[in-house]
């Protein structure tokens, strides 16, 4: 009888402890909405495998956006806590004092973003008077303006139209535009019927490099630093496998199908797009998330001010960049 009673008390105690642990887990659970775009990068494997949620214990809602400007609006409203944007919208956000900070570099952009034009445009000078579409306040907008400056063409000599990528694809098919500076998957569709006049790798060599970055709302980062660190860790871990053996990684059918699905491009085009950008391991992330990214924001802001896109340029943008989360990843045993 005493053994039965002791057994019952033991069982009740276990049930109580289990209930308390479940209650604590529920209280700790964090809801986070992540804004992603359609770039084809190795870290998207982490998204597909849900490794961020597994590492953090958070409930994650991944939402696809067509451009950085739309991501900024979602970040500003609080609908999104973590978002993927380019260095141009980042400069705009910092100039507008949006309370966000860069915590991870997704990629240094190269041939994955390009200016594609109709085949009758033979040289940059043929752009004068033509209709060129681009999503305003995007990395490609910045790269287009930088290209025109390099070629000695004033922006007002070209009819620059503000269109989102899906609208660019439709306008191209209708014959409403003569070209567009855009990214995957639309850039791939345009290139089937047109030709690449320049790309962001070339523009970077001309002195106007661009980045894709991950940013987080500062209030969310302060409340949930472990969640942000888990995001950085999951992305860098997925990327690490690619950097260790790029060609072998790109031969894995599961990688190709994952990136094709999340980026909207055919599997056959994935390798070229992935190789078109540069991805930074954790040590390089730590080195870049400081003065280099601060300078990139400032240089971009200065250019955008010259073009009349923002009213002023600050002398210091370090408040919008942090390396503390990638340093946590670097310090962890698994890194």
Segments (PLM) and residue ranges:
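Pocket-lining segment of extracytoplasmic ligand-binding domains
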Residues: 88, 161, 167-262
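Sec/Tat signal peptide C-region and signal peptidase I cleavage site
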Residues: 23-29
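Short, glycine-/small- and polar/acidic-enriched structural segments
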Residues: 30-162, 178-184, 195, 200, ...
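Bacterial N-terminal signal peptides that target proteins for export
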Residues: 2-16
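Short, solvent-exposed loop/beta-turn-alpha elements that line the ligand-binding surface or hinge
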Residues: 54-57, 202-206, 282-291
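Secondary-structure end/capping motifs
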Residues: 222-309
């Amino acid at each position: 009888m005493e053994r039965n009673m002791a057994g019952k008390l033991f069982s009740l105690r276990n049930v109580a402890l289990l209930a308390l642990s479940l209650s604590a887990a529920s209280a700790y659970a964090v809801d986070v909405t992540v804004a992603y775009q359609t770039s084809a990068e190795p870290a998207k494997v982490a998204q597909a495998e849900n490794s961020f949620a597994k590492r953090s214990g958070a409930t994650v809602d991944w939402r696809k956006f067509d451009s950085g400007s739309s991501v900024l609006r979602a970040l500003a409203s609080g609908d999104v806590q973590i978002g993927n944007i380019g260095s141009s919208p980042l400069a705009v956000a910092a100039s507008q004092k949006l309370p966000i900070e860069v915590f991870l570099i997704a990629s240094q952009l190269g041939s994955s973003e390009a200016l594609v034009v109709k085949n009758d445009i033979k040289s940059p000078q043929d752009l004068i008077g033509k209709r060129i579409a681009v999503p305003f306040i995007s990395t490609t907008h910045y790269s287009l303006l930088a290209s025109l400056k390099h070629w000695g063409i004033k922006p007002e000599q070209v009819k620059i139209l503000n269109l989102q990528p899906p609208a660019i694809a439709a306008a191209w098919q209708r014959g409403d535009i003569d070209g567009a500076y855009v990214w995957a998957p639309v850039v791939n569709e345009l290139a089937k019927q047109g030709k690449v006049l320049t790309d962001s790798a070339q523009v970077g060599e001309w002195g106007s490099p661009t980045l894709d970055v991950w940013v987080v709302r500062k209030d969310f980062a302060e409340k949930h630093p472990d969640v942000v660190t888990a995001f950085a860790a999951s992305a860098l871990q997925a990327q690490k496998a690619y950097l260790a053996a790029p060609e072998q990684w790109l031969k894995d059918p599961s990688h190709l199908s994952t990136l094709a699905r999340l980026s909207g491009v055919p599997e056959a085009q994935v390798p070229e797009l992935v190789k078109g950008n540069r991805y930074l391991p954790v040590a390089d992330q730590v080195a870049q998330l400081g003065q280099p990214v601060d300078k990139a924001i400032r240089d971009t802001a200065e250019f955008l001010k010259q073009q009349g896109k923002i009213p002023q340029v600050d002398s210091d943008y370090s408040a919008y960049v942090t390396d503390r989360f990638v340093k946590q990843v670097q310090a962890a045993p698994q890194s």
